[in-house]
């Protein structure tokens, strides 16, 4: 019964995500990152901007949280945050910056408060920056849909990959496709990223309003 409930929660999250796909304008490949110099508070107390985190070969931004089964895991899904550390280390090895962004403004008094972010980062041994996106401003500017949702920019802040970390969510997959890991390797070698766009899967970002922004 617990197994069924978890699967129902994940399916419900997918349903909510699909209902909100068209609400926010989406960054597309070759678009430039907005809000490059806006500072956000990290769980270590420091302030970071996208510009300060970008390295010589780019920056990876992953919208994440403390509570979504796609991030933290469930009985039938390990959770993508278990890959964060290895992806972060691979990014560093290829001179690429890396940041986790929590935009769940609608849960700031609950599981995604700043205090809970600090606690979660310690429990999961996060070594990468994990920042608060106040009022989900960055998520809105990016058009971020889900937790997780990946945006990978090159050294000029041009978007070169966006979507999912891999295809492990797909129970019918014929092979494993580590999209983000492959994108990091390709960018590190100066090669073209293929595919450069995949469908993000996860829980919908918990914004405080569903009113579209122009």
Model segments located where?
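Bacterial Sec-dependent N-terminal signal peptides
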Residues: 1-28
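N-terminal "domain-start" segment that seeds a small globular fold
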Residues: 24-51, 79-80
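Short active-site neighborhood of thiol/selenol oxidoreductases, capturing the structured segment around
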Residues: 49-76, 184
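Loop/turn elements at helix/coil->beta-strand transitions in domains of secreted/extracellular proteins
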Residues: 56-59, 93-98, 125-129, 155-156
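Short, thiol/selenol-centered motifs that function as redox-active sites or metal-ligating centers
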Residues: 65-81, 150, 203-206
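Structural microenvironment flanking redox-active thiols in thiol-disulfide oxidoreductases
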Residues: 71-123, 137-139
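Short, internal strand/loop/helix patches
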Residues: 116-154
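Thiol-/selenol-based redox modules, centered on thioredoxin-like
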Residues: 152-214
């Amino acid at each position: 019964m617990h197994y069924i409930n978890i699967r129902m929660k994940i399916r419900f999250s997918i349903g909510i995500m699909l209902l909100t796909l068209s609400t926010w304008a989406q960054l597309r490949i070759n678009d430039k990152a907005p809000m490059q110099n806006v500072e956000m508070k990290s769980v270590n107390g420091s302030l970071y901007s996208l510009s300060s985190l970008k390295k010589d070969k780019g920056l990876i931004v992953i919208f994440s949280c403390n509570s979504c089964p796609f991030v933290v895991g469930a009985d039938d899904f390990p959770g993508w945050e278990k890959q964060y550390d290895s992806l972060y280390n691979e990014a560093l090895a290829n001179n690429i910056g890396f940041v986790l962004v929590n935009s769940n403004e609608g849960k700031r008094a609950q599981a995604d408060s700043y205090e809970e972010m600090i606690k979660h980062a310690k429990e999961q041994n996060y070594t990468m920056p994990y920042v608060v996106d106040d009022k989900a401003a960055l998520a809105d500017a990016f058009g971020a849909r889900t937790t997780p949702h990946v945006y990978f920019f090159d050294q000029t802040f041009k978007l070169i990959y966006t979507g999912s970390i891999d295809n492990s969510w797909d129970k019918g997959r014929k092979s494993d496709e580590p999209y983000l890991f492959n994108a990091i390797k390709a960018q590190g070698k100066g090669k073209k990223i293929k595919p450069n766009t995949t469908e993000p899967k996860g829980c919908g970002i918990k914004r405080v309003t569903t009113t579209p922004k122009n």
